[in-house]
Amino acid sequence: MSKNMEYRKHRIEYLRTTVEYSLFGGEGGTREAHLMFHVDPEAGSYEEQLTAIRKAYHRILSRKVKIRGMVPVFCRYFLSDAANQWEALQAVLQKEPSCAVSVVQQPPLDGSKIALWVYLTSEPNAAYKHYWTAGAGVSCGKSERQMKTLLKSYEADLVGKG
C-alpha cells in the first residue's frame, strides 16, 4: 500500500483561527493526522483565545471528512504564561474526552497566548499499541542512573500491561 500525504491550511474567520494539518495514510490502512491550531494574536484575552482554539478543534473534528472518525492520541498546548494560564486550561480539559495532554511554556511565535498541536489516528493497529506517558522523571543521582531507573520503570509498566 502506498502512503498518501496531504497538507492543508484552513481558516475559520469568525473564530480568527487558522488550522494547518497534515494527513497520512490511504485506503484500507490506518490514517494519521497532525493538526496545528493558531489564533490571531489580537483575538482577545487568553480565555477568549482558548475558547476560539477549542471551538476550532471541535469544528474541524466534526466537519472535515478526511478527519472525521479519527481520535486524538495527544494534544500539546503551547502557552505564553503557563503558570497563570494552566488553571483555565485545566477547567476546559476536564470537560473533554480523554487523551494524553502536555503543556509547554513556550509562547507561540505569532504573538498569541496559546497554540495547539493535536495528533490523531483513525484506528488502532492490531500489531502494536501506543502507550503515552508524561511527567516521568528521576530527581536523584547522575544522569546515567536517572536514565536507567526511568527505563526500568517503563519496562515494569509494559510488563504489567502484558
Protein language model regions, located:
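Short, polar/acidic, helix-capping and beta-turn segments at strand->helix junctions
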Residues: M1-G162
